[in-house]
């Protein structure tokens, strides 16, 4: 074991393959949650509030996964036990969530939401919690086992597999509709095309996580210490650092990359929340009221297609990211990608043809590709190895917090700034990405 050893491409691939299945689950959630809750009876101005729970749970869970997996050393591995636990919970919830409308929970309960919505909310909370438990270890294992020279490649592979999983998850509903599974249902009931998408996604998630679990051998404590140039437990007993102490000692890149993350993830929260309504009104002449209408549910399928094209664009952009990083370095590649994504968001305002709209979402994919790879490359290169998992867990707050803020203020922005126009929220997302690109100049790379 040498500090500068390289992993083969196959080893790097195995490290992240389970991410393919996890991302299918995440894609199904991202593309269908607004559709599901609108079908259950949510008002468009309420939709963003349903998106508070996923990032909130992520902000709580991922730092805990990072902290405790840093201290987990057993025969199953260090990070891998969390993969299995997260995947098992996610599979169970994916079988329940799309059936929320089948339990005839019609009565209005707390905050004016019917019982089906509350059932869906709690299912969503557990789904996102479990996805977070399963997702975070993949990023940590790259930080644990890959040297600085290969991290860019490792996270690019992860980004590619992530987007491939997204592509599969996004097209499931329209694919099942094409083969004859019903895409409409009685009012308040989720269509079968969506239900079967979640069922198949759950099966693939479990298989992919099992593949990584079986094929990856994590470093033992002695190997890990040698790889990262740390003292072993035999050499030194270190006090477990507190949350506050870790934040105080965080490298400046933690905060500057986090600022860029704030604008980026707020933008994508708006995309996930409002794409269904925006596309339905912009391209399918939806009346803005009847969510059981064919126009709304057809638009719901097309959202999946748009997100799939975004994933394809992201995969293609991920392939050229190493070249961009070579000529413009990490920061330049990051900023360029965000600007391309911003143009994609803003262009949706002028598009009324559903097929032309695909070009806009392909451009948006450039920003997504950069968001999945560059921040983690910059951050992990600035960290020492002893609290890598905890810092990556804390860094997840820069993903979750902006989504929470965007979810809380999204309804007000829709009402008072965008005058009820959901397509206006996509333009707002483009403006946020431009602010993110400008903020890239504040990042200083390298270890503290």
Specify the residue positions occupied by each region the protein language model found:
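Helix-to-loop junctions at the C-terminal end of transmembrane segments
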Residues: 60-76, 316-329, 414
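Intracellular loop-helix junctions on the cytosolic face of multi-pass helical membrane proteins
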Residues: 1-10, 106-107, 111-123, 133-134, ...
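C-terminal transmembrane helical hairpin of 12-TM major facilitator-type secondary transporters
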Residues: 325-375
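C-terminal ends and interior cores of transmembrane alpha-helices
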Residues: 84-113, 340-352
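Helix-loop boundary and gating motifs at the non-cytosolic
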Residues: 2-57, 256, 260, 264-289
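Intracellular juxtamembrane helix-capping segments at the cytosolic ends
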Residues: 133-146, 370-384
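A late C-terminal transmembrane helix in Major Facilitator Superfamily
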Residues: 386-416
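Loop-to-transmembrane helix entry/capping segments in MFS-fold secondary transporters
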Residues: 44-45, 148-158, 300, 383-395
């Amino acid at each position: 074991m040498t500090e500068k050893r390289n992993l083969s491409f196959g080893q790097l691939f195995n490290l992240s393959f389970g991410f393919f299945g996890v991302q299918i689950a995440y894609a199904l959630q991202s593309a269908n949650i607004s559709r599901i809750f609108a079908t259950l009876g949510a008002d468009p101005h309420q939709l963003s509030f349903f998106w508070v729970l996923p990032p909130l749970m992520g902000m709580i869970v991922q730092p805990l996964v990072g902290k405790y997996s840093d201290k987990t050393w057993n025969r199953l591995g260090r990070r891998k036990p969390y993969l299995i636990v997260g995947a098992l919970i996610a599979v169970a919830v994916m079988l329940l969530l799309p059936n929320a409308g089948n339990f005839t929970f019609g009565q209005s309960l707390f905050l004016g939401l019917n019982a089906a919505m509350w059932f869906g909310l709690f299912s969503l909370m557990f789904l996102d919690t479990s996805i977070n438990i399963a997702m975070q270890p993949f990023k940590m294992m790259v930080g644990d086992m890959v040297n600085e020279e290969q991290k860019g490649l490792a996270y690019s592979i992860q980004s590619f597999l992530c987007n491939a999983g997204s592509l599969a998850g996004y097209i499931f509903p329209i694919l099942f509709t094409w083969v004859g599974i019903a895409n409409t249902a009685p009012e308040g009931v989720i269509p079968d095309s969506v239900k079967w998408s979640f069922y198949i996604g759950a099966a693939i998630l479990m298989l992919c996580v099992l593949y990584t679990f079986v094929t990856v051998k994590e470093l033992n404590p002695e190997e890990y210490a040698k790889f990262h140039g740390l003292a072993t437990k035999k050499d030194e007993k270190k006090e477990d650092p507190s949350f506050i102490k870790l934040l105080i000692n965080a490298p400046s890149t933690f905060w500057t990359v986090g600022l860029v993350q704030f604008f980026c993830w707020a933008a994508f929260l708006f995309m996930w929340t409002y794409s269904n309504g925006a596309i339905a009104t912009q391209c399918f002449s939806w009346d803005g009221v009847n969510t059981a209408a064919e126009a709304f549910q057809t638009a719901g399928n097309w959202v999946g297609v748009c997100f799939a094209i975004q994933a394809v664009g992201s995969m293609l952009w991920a392939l050229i990211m190493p070249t961009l990083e070579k000529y413009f370095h990490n920061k330049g590649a990051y900023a360029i990608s965000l600007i391309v994504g911003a143009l994609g968001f803003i262009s949706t305002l002028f598009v009324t043809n559903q097929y032309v709209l695909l070009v806009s979402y392909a451009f948006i994919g450039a920003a997504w590709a950069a968001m999945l790879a560059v921040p983690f490359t910059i951050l992990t290169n600035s960290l020492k190895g002893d609290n890598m998992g905890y810092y990556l867990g804390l860094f997840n707050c820069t993903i979750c917090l902006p989504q929470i803020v965007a979810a809380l203020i999204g309804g007000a922005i829709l009402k008072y700034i965008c005058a009820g126009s959901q397509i206006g929220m996509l333009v707002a997302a483009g403006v946020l990405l431009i602010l993110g690109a400008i903020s890239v100049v504040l990042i200083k790379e390298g270890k503290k």
